[in-house]
Every structure is written in structure tokens, then in C-alpha cells.
Amino acid sequence: MVPGVPVHAIQRGNNRAPCFVDDEDRAFFLHHLGRLARDESCAVHAYCLMTNHVHLLLTPEREESCARLFKRLGLLHTQYTNRRYRRSGTLWEGRFRSCLVQSDYYLLACYRYIELNPVRAGMVAHPGDYLWSSYRSNAEGTMDPRITPHAEYLSLGRDQYRLLFGRHIDPDLEREIRATTNGGYALGAEAFKRRMADFLGRRVSKGSPGRPSRAGSQETMEPKLF
């Protein structure tokens, strides 16, 4: 991870099995998410707990912050689940998947992508109807001690943020978010990807193995919010 650069991360249940059975399980996870995120210097901007996976939008202060957060939170929730349901073994599917996110249009798209998960899954008609995401905090102002608003969100403002949900996310952008997250790439313009590749010393977009060439790269024009 790159300190100060937002991350969209997803952690799935092992074999895509449920990792939350009821609201008590979800409340336990969220309580410790807030505590451990503070411990590991990760700012939580958005989240959504689905039945068999979790989405988080984070900004780590240190390179190891996200990995330590997921390791500690995953272990704690596994121990809790195994005790409560008298089971054994792993709960989660290996390492979490993630992408680096450029702090502009792409970041706000990830906010919405995360908070619209229950709508896409057909669980609710409106994101505000789902209790286990950050939508009510980010769009409606409900107090949530886990949430640290990103500067990009603050510059937009809550009312304008809420209006974004009146439009669908572009399907191509949805696919890009999924692909970059599953592939461990970077989500953003070409200049952002070059900076991330230089910092990490590895490729952060699809292509042949090895460090990407800087020759011929061009900055792409950012899509408009509205």
C-alpha cells in the first residue's frame, strides 16, 4: 500500500460462504472495525457488510496499515464466529483484494459503488434502507464513529453527495472498479498509475509482466461528476 493513497478493499468469506449470520455478528464486526482502524492508523471513509463479503474504502497512514487491520480484524471475527457457532477452521478467503484509488472522481465512484452494493444485490430498493453500510452517515448525516470523511467528500458536501445516487454508475466504470480490485491494480488516470507503479516498483494495470514503460504515456481526461 501507499501511505496517504485511498484503497478500495474487499474481503470474502471462504468459498463465498456467509461470514455474518445475524445483526449481532455485523455489530461485532463494525465495533472492532472502528477500534482496530484507529489502532492501525487507517481512516475509514465507506463500508458495506454483505452476507458473504465486506467492502471498505480506507486511507492508510503507513504501508502496512491495511494489511495489519485486515489480519487483526479477520482473526478476531473468526475467533468470535467459531466460539458463537461452535465451528472451527477459517472464515475468510485468504488475503483481501484491493486497488489503489485516485483521490477525485474515482474515489467518489468507489464511495457509491460500495454503498450501492445492497441495491445491486436486490436486498433493498434504496441504499438508505440498508442498515449495514456507511450510506446513512455519508448521505444523511447519521453519526457513525467509524467514519472519517475524505477531503474529496468534504469538498463536495453531503447534499451534493446524496444527489450522486440519483444516477447510475457507468457500467464500464463498475467493471473497472471490479477488475482493478480483483487484480490488485490502481484505479485512476494514467499519470496516477505511473506514480503508483514508480512507488511500488511493479505494474499497477493490466499488461505484460514487469515494470511498465514510461514512454508514450498520456494523461487521460477525467470524467465529469454530473
Task: Locate each region found by the language model.
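Short Pro-Cys-Gly-centered "Cys-loop" motif that presents a nucleophilic cysteine in a tight turn
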Residues: M1-M50, T59-F226
